[in-house]
């Protein structure tokens, strides 16, 4: 019998938060137990939940900042200690919680001398700063500084091109990931035909969501993803044998392409940090300008072996991490890019 009263015999899978702690304003930890699973099921759920928690749970972030009278990102302003670039980096780190999914504006309007923090930002009612003490800039002289901020909600990462911005507006490399890390482990119990598995999931968030909220959102996302299969009818399945010349096959192929595109978009927004590779392998990939999972999947095993200081052991570590965290594998050969003739 589990702590919350769930027995193996009734086979009702239940979950419970068995540990929760606030390590800091921007680091919350939760540990969850889910059971009982039949053999093999716990690992399936663990992989799916880890991927959903890291890739499907969205958040709010500052995506751009507009400065008055600033020519370029590396400009310095008299009376301000930091460069514009340094300020943008600090704005990237600001943790926000938004109750609205739409784009919103915020204003940072202060007069020096002053040490400016996140608590000085004037936000719309639906947005709040998680940690008022997060540092932004120091104004060393009695001057006024006005910065217009754009806030958006999304999932994953977003790296904008500077070429798309004009008139003193600069992009902020936004991070829309309330979930910082996820671990899971599977533990068998019982014996023989009564052998079952317990799944433990550990979740770390940035404080904008509690781990329990993150688990709930990830679960809903996974359910929504699978719900179309609950309503499939026989007539929805194309009869390829009797209708080879119809448009059914083309429509079905188009749907498959949409699924591939969705996964491709996910990998484009997921950085290789999530693989938790050893430092040697990670640094080699970064030196080769491999920053996202999408970048990594454009290399075959043989391609990776050609990288400087990247041996078979490192390739095996990458392959194992890709499978364990994203249930995907390196291609057998370098993917062909259309137009490369």
Curated annotation (Swiss-Prot):
Keywords: Chloroplast, DNA-directed RNA polymerase, Nucleotidyltransferase, Plastid, Transcription, Transferase. Residues 1-233 are annotated as: Alpha N-terminal domain (alpha-NTD). One of its GO terms (biological process) is DNA-templated transcription. The keyword Cell cycle does not apply. It comes from the Eukaryota. It catalyses: RNA(n) + a ribonucleoside 5'-triphosphate = RNA(n+1) + diphosphate. It is an enzyme of class 2 (transferase). Its main location: plastid. One of its GO terms (cellular component) is mitochondrion. Its EC number is 2.7.7.6. Residues 262-341 are annotated as: Alpha C-terminal domain (alpha-CTD). Disulfide bonds: none annotated. In plastids the minimal PEP RNA polymerase catalytic core is composed of four subunits: alpha, beta, beta', and beta''. When a (nuclear-encoded) sigma factor is associated with the core the holoenzyme is formed, which can initiate transcription. DNA-dependent RNA polymerase catalyzes the transcription of DNA into RNA using the four ribonucleoside triphosphates as substrates. The N-terminal domain is essential for RNAP assembly and basal transcription, whereas the C-terminal domain is involved in interaction with transcriptional regulators and with upstream promoter elements. This is DNA-directed RNA polymerase subunit alpha. The lineage of its organism: Eukaryota, Viridiplantae, Streptophyta, Embryophyta, Tracheophyta. The gene is rpoA.
